[in-house]
Structure formats: C-alpha cells, structure tokens
Amino acid sequence: MLPMITGFMNYGQQTLRAARYIGQGFMITLSHTNRLPVTIQYPYEKLITSERFRGRIHFEFDKCIACEVCVRVCPIDLPVVDWKLETNIRKKRLLNYSIDFGICIFCGNCVEYCPTNCLSMTEEYEFSTYDRHELNYNQIALGRLPMSVIDDYTIRTILNSPQTKNGENPLI
C-alpha cells in the first residue's frame, strides 16, 4: 500500500512540474504577442538604414585629384585609378576610376581618408546579379545616385528599431 501512495505522489509531482513548464512556455508566448513582427515583406517593404550605413560608394569625378589615397588605405587595394600626368601644368589628370563591388568589403576606409571628399557611402545595398562582371562599376556608374528608399513611393518603409505595439522601445 505504501509504494502505491508514493507512486501516486511522484506522479502528482511530475504532473505539477510538467504543468509549470507548460505554463512558463505559454507565458513567454503571451509576452511575444505585444511585440511588432520581426519579418518584413522584402520587395514591397524595406528597412530605413541608419545614417552610418555603409552601402554602395558614390564617386564624384570632378572632385577627384587622383592622389590614390583610397587605394593605399584599402585593405584589398581595390579601387582602380588610371591617371595621366599633365606635364605642362604638373598635375595628374584622372582618366578612369572603378570599383568592383564583388570584391569590396565595404569597410569605408576610402571614404574616410579621401582628402577631397569625392567618395561617399549611399544607402543602396542591393547588388543581386547573374553575372559578377556587372558588379564592376566605373566612374559613370559610381556617379549615379541611387533612389532613396524614403523617396520611393512604391515601397513601404519601416523604421529599423525594435519597438512594441505600445510605441515604447524595449532596449531603452
């Protein structure tokens, strides 16, 4: 009789422990109902990038003095700068400037150390292509400014900060 009573007590304790674990999981599930969804519908919705986002590089041909500082500070010697020395004025004349974004690691050193600020980072991050040679941008392609995500009326923009439905930020 005694082993039967202890067996029922053990069964009751295990049942209570299982119910407590199920209750804990249910409480976690309920706490997540107050949060905004994490996923977005990508082609139709895009996240607004921060100001310091390092996207595609924008190049201004007229400002460049062909000093090649960008090549020297690049960890992979990526920018290709072709120039010609003008002997009559003793200055370099820029002929061609290109960057292969298939190799670029987007470190931002070229933008940071450029003495004339002819390089800047944009918010463009979509580089999908079927041919890797299309990722090699010359000065004409680098000079085009991409359309801002905020200005594109076909895309719904979403702030890139975790918030709850009540509007409070849980990280603060």
From Swiss-Prot:
Location(s) in or outside the cell: Plastid, Chloroplast thylakoid membrane
Cofactor needs: [4Fe-4S] cluster
InterPro entries: 4Fe4S_Fe-S-bd, 4Fe4S_Fe_S_CS, NADH_quinone_OxRdtase_chainI, NDHI
One MF term in the entry's GO annotations: iron ion binding
PROSITE patterns xref list: 4FE4S_FER_1, 4FE4S_FER_2
Alphabetical list of Pfam families matching this protein: Fer4_9
Reaction(s) this enzyme catalyzes, per UniProt: a plastoquinone + NADH + (n+1) H(+)(in) = a plastoquinol + NAD(+) + n H(+)(out); a plastoquinone + NADPH + (n+1) H(+)(in) = a plastoquinol + NADP(+) + n H(+)(out)
Entry binding sites for [4Fe-4S] cluster 2: 74, 104, 107, 110
4Fe-4S ferredoxin-type domain: residues covered: 55-84, 95-124
Cofactor details (free text): Binds 2 [4Fe-4S] clusters per subunit.
Keyword Lyase: no
Residues annotated as binding [4Fe-4S] cluster 1: 64, 67, 70, 114
EC number(s) given by UniProt: 7.1.1.-
GO biological-process terms attached to the record: photosynthesis, light reaction
Keyword Chloroplast: yes
Keyword annotations: 4Fe-4S, Chloroplast, Iron, Iron-sulfur, Membrane, Metal-binding, NAD, NADP, Plastid, Plastoquinone, Quinone, Repeat, Thylakoid, Translocase
Gene Ontology cellular component annotations, sorted alphabetically: chloroplast thylakoid membrane
Disulfide bonds: none
Membrane-protein topology: Peripheral membrane protein
Main location: plastid
Family: Belongs to the complex I 23 kDa subunit family.
NCBIfam families, per database record: ndhI (TIGR00403), NuoI (TIGR01971), PRK05888.1-3 (NF004537)
Assembly behavior: NDH is composed of at least 16 different subunits, 5 of which are encoded in the nucleus.
UniProt function note: NDH shuttles electrons from NAD(P)H:plastoquinone, via FMN and iron-sulfur (Fe-S) centers, to quinones in the photosynthetic chain and possibly in a chloroplast respiratory chain. The immediate electron acceptor for the enzyme in this species is believed to be plastoquinone. Couples the redox reaction to proton translocation, and thus conserves the redox energy in a proton gradient.
Protein name (record): NAD(P)H-quinone oxidoreductase subunit I, chloroplastic
Organism whose genome encodes this protein: Crucihimalaya wallichii (Rock-cress)
